[in-house]
Amino acid sequence: MEAERRPGPVRRRRRSGLAGRFANRLVRAAVLVAIVPLVLTLIYCLPFVHPVSTLMLADLATLRGYERQWTPLEEAGRNVIHSVMMSEDGQFCSHRGIDLGELKAAINEALSGERTRGASTIPMQTVKNLYLWPGRSFLRKAIEAPLAIYLDAVMPKHRIMEIYLNIAEWGPGIYGVEAAAQHYFGRPSRDLSRREAALLAVTLPNPSERNPAQPSAALRRLASVVEARAQRAGGYVGCLGST
């Protein structure tokens, strides 16, 4: 009976070499994927660049198309800017990409088994819209947080807000505050009343199920709260200049 043949040293070295090359390529690909958003963020700092979101790209890829009219921040309208900020991220001007207080509270709620609150800041939502995928997951949050800190470090606050307002989804195929204002209220965003601006703002967390033009009673109550906050937003919006 012949002795069982064992792989020789040459074969083992060949397998080891293939595994090493595969691992090397995998690392290079991971580094490339990590670098892309860092480079794009620097490009998006330029005021004449009009970024698109991953959802907008998906709409183009599936031939659905989308509505979006890029609007400079100073033309978006004070009512909309203040309402969105007070609804989505009241500490936008004071934090550095992530709101540690809200994040800590959300983590504590998750660990205790409670339903977690939203802890996403406007920078976090902006990098999610620009580079990541929708839906909730710890993996996405783990990527989102450092990207948001980087975004806030290299990009002026007013530019972050401008990009966010122009790529946020306000319904199927409707992106940006100007397209939303025209679609739901038939007028430019700068001409929206405080009430209309508040209704648009409270639609953002769930635009597929909330309609600012036909709000439910609960949505109207939430809009009333945001409208009141927006009227007192003076001390919170200093980083946005005279908007």
UniProtKB/Swiss-Prot annotation:
InterPro entries: Glyco_trans_51, Lysozyme-like_dom_sf, PBP_transglycosylase, Pep_trsgly. It catalyses: [GlcNAc-(1->4)-Mur2Ac(oyl-L-Ala-gamma-D-Glu-L-Lys-D-Ala-D-Ala)](n)-di-trans,octa-cis-undecaprenyl diphosphate + beta-D-GlcNAc-(1->4)-Mur2Ac(oyl-L-Ala-gamma-D-Glu-L-Lys-D-Ala-D-Ala)-di-trans,octa-cis-undecaprenyl diphosphate = [GlcNAc-(1->4)-Mur2Ac(oyl-L-Ala-gamma-D-Glu-L-Lys-D-Ala-D-Ala)](n+1)-di-trans,octa-cis-undecaprenyl diphosphate + di-trans,octa-cis-undecaprenyl diphosphate + H(+). Keywords: Cell inner membrane, Cell membrane, Cell shape, Cell wall biogenesis/degradation, Glycosyltransferase, Membrane, Peptidoglycan synthesis, Transferase, Transmembrane, Transmembrane helix. The keyword Ion transport does not apply. One of its GO terms (molecular function) is pentosyltransferase activity. Pathway: Cell wall biogenesis; peptidoglycan biosynthesis. Its EC number is 2.4.99.28. GO terms for biological process: cell wall organization; peptidoglycan biosynthetic process; regulation of cell shape. GO terms for cellular component: peptidoglycan-based cell wall; plasma membrane. It is an enzyme of class 2 (transferase). It is a single-pass membrane protein. Belongs to the glycosyltransferase 51 family. Peptidoglycan polymerase that catalyzes glycan chain elongation from lipid-linked precursors. HAMAP family: PGT_MtgA (MF_00766). This is Biosynthetic peptidoglycan transglycosylase. It comes from Chelativorans sp. (strain BNC1). The lineage of its organism: Bacteria, Pseudomonadati, Pseudomonadota, Alphaproteobacteria, Hyphomicrobiales.
